[in-house]
């Protein structure tokens, strides 16, 4: 009996699993680092189990963990996504982002925790402000889909969260002005902040990034922000993969 127990025990013992996480996404900066970790964990576990879950099932599970699909959908699917979570079901549409665009993430040296960013929002908003944002929410994907990059600036204007969160983001107004001066088609707060994201034409990328680098040096130390990190980014239309 003892020999059989030992044999069965040996059969159940598997090599230990070592997990090493390398996450280049700055944390607590409004860039979806938590969602990226959720997707990485789910994809890794799914692969180890033999890919038992399909993409829709993974998206639903990730949304249940995160609480909303806003970040996990693009982290999993890539591209530009529009998503709704209703009665436990995620409805999501993805479209590739035009590669003629490039992106700049301007990351300050301070964090803005999601809890603090949410607390800054008012309990109620004016009806006209809600309408203002709804019209732009419809214009953003339309502008991307039709290649109307000239509309991205007005499409990303906001009255529901940026006016309340930017006072918590030292130097953000100056960064907005700098990015527009450097030729950005659109500038907006990434997620809940504290990162500012700017969109430009790839044909102007060299001048755009050079102008940002030079301008950010002059803003360092302004209003309590000691330094900014400039991340030069491309749109990822592939989404999460397991290698």
Question: Predicted regions: what is each one?
Answer:
Residues 1-13:
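Single conserved hydrophobic/aromatic residue that forms the stacking wall/gate
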Residues 23-32, 62-69, 123-128:
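A short glycine/serine-rich beta->alpha loop
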Residues 53-101, 167, 173, 187-189:
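Alpha/beta catalytic cores of group-transfer enzymes, especially the acyltransferase/condensing modules
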Residues 144-243:
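Glycine-rich, charge-dense phosphate/pyrophosphate-binding loop(s)
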């Amino acid at each position: 009996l003892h020999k059989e127990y030992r044999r069965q025990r040996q059969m159940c013992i598997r090599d230990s699993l070592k997990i090493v996480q390398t996450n280049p996404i700055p944390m607590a900066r409004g860039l979806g680092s938590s969602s990226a970790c959720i997707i990485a964990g789910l994809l890794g576990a799914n692969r180890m189990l033999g890919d038992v879950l399909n993409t829709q099932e993974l998206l639903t599970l990730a949304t249940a963990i995160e609480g909303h699909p806003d970040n996990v959908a693009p982290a999993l699917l890539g591209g530009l996504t529009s998503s709704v979570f209703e009665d436990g079901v995620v409805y999501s549409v993805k479209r590739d982002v035009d590669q003629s665009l490039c992106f700049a993430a301007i990351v300050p040296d301070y964090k803005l925790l999601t809890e603090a960013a949410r607390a800054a929002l008012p309990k109620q908003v004016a009806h006209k402000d809600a309408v203002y944002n709804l019209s732009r929410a419809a214009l953003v994907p339309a502008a991307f889909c039709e290649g109307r990059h000239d509309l991205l600036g007005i499409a990303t204007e906001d009255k529901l969260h940026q006016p309340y969160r930017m006072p918590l983001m030292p130097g953000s107004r100056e960064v907005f002005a700098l990015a527009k001066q450097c030729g950005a088609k659109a500038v907006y707060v990434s997620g809940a902040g504290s990162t500012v994201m700017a969109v430009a034409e790839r044909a102007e990328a060299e001048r755009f990034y050079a102008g940002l680098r030079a301008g950010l040096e002059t803003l360092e130390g302004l209003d309590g922000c000691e330094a900014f990190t400039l991340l030069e980014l491309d749109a990822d239309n592939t989404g999460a993969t397991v290698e």
